[in-house]
């Protein structure tokens, strides 16, 4: 394959390394080292292979132990190559060869080994087919592939693939890994020629966290291996765990050269967090085994529950002697199917029949714990670190029997990555097949000059041009590896030998499919097995009922703190997953697991505290006892008021009604009626309309009553006080004047109410006396309501003052006394109402009821005190409702005589009459004097004064008692 790398510096460096290696081959000290051991099969196209056949060595690149998985993966590549070469439908006429090397599970050594692939790709330098058998000059290796590497299968460890991919990309050599899962390998800006038949660890990390969440484990420890596999994998896992509220109690890293003390220290740290019973392992298989060994040495009283990545997977040998510690472990393994034909292939292999694999003899000895004596089947590695003769305890082993065969009885089990190795080989094969179809089937024969040019430029073409049977064409040899990777390799899609779909995404990653395994004791047996308990493909599907736990009959917990009960929140202490549970306030709901939030006014949390609901809005209901009582009083008051109005209307022109001052009497009755009706406005559901009625009704209703009473008391006071001082007729005491004065006083209250509505527009509001109550009320502040009644209080106060001033008027003038009694009682009611009203602010029902009853009582006092005497006469003594009534009061007679003589009266009132006047006291017209003593003309000061009494008279042509006529006041009669 023609390389297009023109970077002279890189070429010089590689040439130096290559020549140094040629020199090394001559060095006796390096003869027969592991470097010279490889699997090389000739072919038209050569694929390289990198597998961890041996473990790491101490003081040497490779250790003595042969890994079962490394040998199986190597054999899987050879098996797949055999199938492709024997398949007439794939690359017909073209043979694929191999050049497979051992990485010894070490990234630096793998990089050194990969230089063999690079040197073979240089135009005039191909030493990969040479060897120095006895320290002499290099000779062509017997099984040399005699050609450059077209692509590489491997490595297994992500750390190995990272090193190798950085080198191979410089020479445009594509690489497909069957096992490297580090996330960073998906970065096409760094690894633009790397692909893999397995998914990146990002998906595996998600699968592991899905398992933790499935068991409700929120507090776990993690252990990861040093290197790209463990470090990148655990980084992705920690990120996913943090996003999903899984906390890490202990996070430990296993160094590359860790000894038993390191592993014992890790277990000791895990024991310090006893609540974190779940332990996630993102380690290589050998590290996982040593962790289990350390756990066994610690003799744990409470076992850990292991959750492991595919580094552990479903390997049986990893757990030999540690089954009791590993029991119940849950592992993740790439979803793979058993290739039955590969098992048959492996089971028919023996050291005698598998001479092409130089490490198979070591694998055989390790599997059967025996020693091969036939040197013909053993690799010449007498000086290597893994030499059989150097193995400890070799003398104790028996000689290998010729009848030995691989089988399940001796512990053979198909390695989990076998399918992905085969898929990687087939991916190259199908991509090369498509390239061959595109470049070779339609091209014409090359000219002689072109063939000579390709022979001089391409080592690979020099090789295939000598093979007359090869169907490979020069264009395949000349095709750039990077273009091959992008145009062919990433675009392959096929169904593999296990029946699974194989394809790559644009990052070169395989499909993410995992099996979830549980390590369980076999039924009716002392053995153990991995049992599939679930799968992961874009999500977890797990049957928790089939999980077996270590020394547990029920699913264990792994949490720093137990979950909080419904309606409680977490208060963190120390680690983010450690908390104490605290209750929310009664009016709060659980906003999130750490926060309570106030539901807000008018809302209350449900019993589970997860959300809030709207509280029922409360207001006075018509059927409430608090409404029925004031309504009954109001209805009774309205009925009485209506009766009085009807009686007054029926007796409109009778002396009693006329003497009462009809205009002010009706005005006062209307005010009383308004006050009673206010009860219904106060009890009605608050709306803008009802709130307007409340404001107008209460203030204006009271102002109508007390404006009329003030006008009456003022008129009485003026008349009786002026009568003793002046004979001039008083102004503004006529009915019309009294109505105007009353209306003016009422208008002031109306104006105050209008201003109040402008300053504080009427409306409704919600009142919250406590968190569980929502009361709908009119938007009236208590103080503004009190201020709006200030004017009425002034009217009441003035009325009361006038009532006190007129308390000593003639005995028979009882209406003034009734007005006084009304005002005294009203003051008492209001003085009692104010503290009760403001003291019951938290109980809207009591407050509203108090207000309604207070208003009704004020109206009832006025109604009873002022109108009951008149109603009594109208109903029970209609015969008294006449002009001629007896005046038998001694006080009245003395007062009348004193007034007639111009002397002061016994009541404190004096009167000096002008010519043509007569004296009136007690609201009655008449005297015991003779007609010659009292003129028939009334005094102008007393005109209409009798309107305040229960005896009718008229001035200026209206009804008057005849001179000398005996008249008795009605109030006096009522009082008898």
UniProtKB/Swiss-Prot annotation:
Subcellular localization is given as: Cell membrane
Q: Which family does it belong to?
A: Belongs to the G-protein coupled receptor 3 family.
Indicate what this protein is called per its UniProt record. Metabotropic glutamate receptor
Principal location? membrane
Q: Which residues bind L-glutamate?
A: 158, 179-181, 229, 310, 417
Which Pfam families does the protein's record reference? 7tm_3, ANF_receptor
Species annotation = Drosophila melanogaster
Topological domain (Extracellular) residues are 26-626, 685-695, 760-782, 841-850
């Amino acid at each position: 394959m023609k390389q297009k790398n023109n970077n002279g510096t890189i070429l010089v460096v590689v040439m130096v390394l290559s020549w140094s290696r040629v020199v090394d081959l001559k060095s006796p000290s390096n003869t027969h080292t592991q470097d010279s051991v490889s699997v090389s099969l000739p072919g038209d196209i050569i694929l390289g292979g990198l597998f961890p056949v041996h473990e790491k060595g101490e003081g040497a690149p490779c250790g003595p132990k042969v890994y079962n998985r490394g040998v199986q993966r190597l054999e899987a590549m050879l098996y797949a190559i055999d199938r492709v070469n024997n398949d007439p439908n794939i690359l017909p006429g073209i043979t694929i060869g191999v050049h497979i090397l051992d990485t010894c599970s070490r990234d630096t050594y793998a990089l050194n080994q990969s230089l063999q692939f690079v040197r073979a790709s240089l135009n005039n330098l191909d030493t990969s087919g040479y060897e120095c058998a006895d320290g002499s000059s290099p000779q062509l290796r017997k099984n040399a592939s005699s050609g450059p590497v077209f692509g590489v299968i491997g490595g297994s460890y992500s750390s190995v693939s990272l090193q190798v991919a950085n080198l191979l990309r410089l020479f445009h050599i594509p690489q497909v890994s069957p096992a490297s899962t580090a996330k960073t390998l998906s970065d096409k800006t760094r690894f633009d020629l790397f692909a893999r038949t397995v998914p990146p660890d990002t998906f595996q990390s998600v699968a592991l966290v899905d398992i933790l969440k499935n068991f409700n484990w929120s507090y776990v420890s993690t252990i990861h291996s040093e290197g790209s596999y463990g470090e990148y994998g655990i980084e992705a896992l920690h990120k996913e765990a943090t996003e999903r509220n899984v906390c890490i109690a202990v996070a430990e890293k296993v160094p590359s050269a860790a000894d038993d003390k390191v592993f014992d220290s890790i277990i000791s740290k895990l024991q310090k967090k006893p609540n974190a019973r779940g332990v996630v392992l993102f380690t290589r298989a050998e590290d996982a085994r040593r962790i289990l060994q350390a756990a066994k040495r610690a003799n744990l009283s409470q076992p850990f529950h292991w959750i492991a990545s595919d580094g552990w997977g479903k390997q049986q040998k990893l757990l030999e002697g540690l089954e009791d510690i590993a029991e119940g472990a849950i592992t993740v393994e790439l979803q793979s199917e058993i290739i039955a034909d590969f098992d048959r292939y492996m089971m028919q292999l023996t050291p005698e029949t598998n001479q092409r694999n130089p490490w198979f003899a070591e694998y055989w000895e390790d599997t059967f714990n025996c020693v091969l004596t036939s040197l013909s089947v053993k690799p010449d590695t007498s000086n290597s670190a893994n030499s059989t003769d150097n193995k400890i305890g070799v003398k104790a082993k028996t000689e290998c029997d010729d009848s030995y065969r691989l089988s399940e009885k001796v512990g053979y089990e198909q390695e989990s990555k076998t399918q992905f190795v085969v898929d990687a080989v087939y991916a190259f094969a199908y991509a090369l097949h498509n390239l061959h179809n595109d470049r070779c089937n339609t091209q014409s024969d090359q000219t002689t000059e072109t063939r000579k040019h390709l022979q001089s430029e391409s080592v690979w073409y020099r090789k295939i041009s000598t093979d007359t049977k090869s169907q490979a064409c020069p264009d395949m040899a000349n095709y750039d590896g990077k273009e091959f990777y992008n145009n062919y390799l990433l675009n392959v899609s096929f169904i593999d030998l296990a029946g699974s779909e194989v394809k790559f995404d644009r990052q070169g990653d395989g499909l993410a499919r995992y099996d979830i395994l549980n390590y369980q004791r076999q039924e009716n047996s002392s053995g153990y097995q991995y049992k599939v308990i679930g799968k992961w493909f874009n999500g977890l599907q797990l049957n928790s009922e089939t999980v077996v736990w270590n020394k547990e009959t029920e699913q264990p917990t792994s949490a720093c703190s137990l979950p909080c009960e419904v309606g409680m929140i977490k208060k963190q202490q120390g680690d983010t997953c450690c908390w104490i549970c605290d209750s929310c306030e009664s009016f709060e709901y659980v906003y999130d697991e750490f926060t309570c939030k106030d539901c807000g006014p008018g809302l209350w949390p449900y019993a589970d505290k997860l959300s809030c609901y709207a509280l029922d809005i409360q207001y006075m209901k018509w059927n409430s006892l608090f409404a029925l009582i004031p309504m009954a009083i109001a209805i009774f008051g309205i009925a009485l008021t209506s009766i009085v109005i009807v009686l007054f209307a029926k007796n409109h022109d009778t002396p009693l009604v006329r003497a009462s001052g009809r205009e002010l009497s009706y005005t006062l009755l209307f005010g009383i009626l308004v006050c009673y009706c206010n009860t219904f406005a106060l009890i009605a559901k608050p709306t803008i309309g009802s709130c307007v009625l409340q404001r107008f009704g209460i203030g204006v209703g009271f102002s109508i009553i007390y404006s009329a009473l003030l006008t009456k008391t003022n008129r009485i006071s003026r008349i009786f006080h002026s009568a003793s001082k002046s004979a001039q007729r008083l102004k503004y005491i006529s009915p019309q004047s009294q109505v105007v004065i009353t209306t003016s006083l009422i208008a002031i209250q109306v104006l105050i109410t209008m201003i109040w509505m402008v300053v504080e527009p009427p409306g409704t509001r919600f009142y919250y006396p406590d968190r569980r109550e929502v009361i709908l009320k009119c938007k009236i502040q208590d103080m503004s309501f009190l201020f709006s009644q200030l004017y009425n209080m002034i009217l009441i106060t003035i009325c009361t003052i006038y009532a006190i001033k007129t308390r000593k008027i003639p005995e028979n003038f009882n209406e003034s006394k009734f007005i006084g009694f009304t005002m005294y009682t009203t003051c008492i009611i209001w003085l009692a109402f104010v503290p009760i009203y403001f003291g019951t602010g938290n109980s809207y029902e009591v407050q509203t009821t108090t207000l309604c009853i207070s208003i009704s009582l004020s109206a009832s006092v006025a109604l009873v005190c002022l109108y009951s005497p008149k109603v009594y006469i109208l109903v029970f003594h209609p015969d008294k409702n006449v002009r001629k009534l007896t005046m038998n009061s001694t006080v009245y007679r003395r007062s009348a005589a004193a007034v007639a003589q111009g002397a002061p009266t016994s009541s404190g009132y004096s009167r000096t009459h002008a010519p043509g006047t007569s004296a009136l006291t007690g609201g009655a017209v008449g005297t015991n004097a003779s007609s010659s003593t009292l003129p028939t003309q009334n005094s102008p000061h007393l005109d209409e004064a009798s309107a305040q009494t229960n005896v009718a008279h008229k001035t200026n042509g209206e009804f008057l008692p005849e001179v000398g006529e005996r008249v008795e006041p009605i109030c006096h009669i009522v009082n008898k």
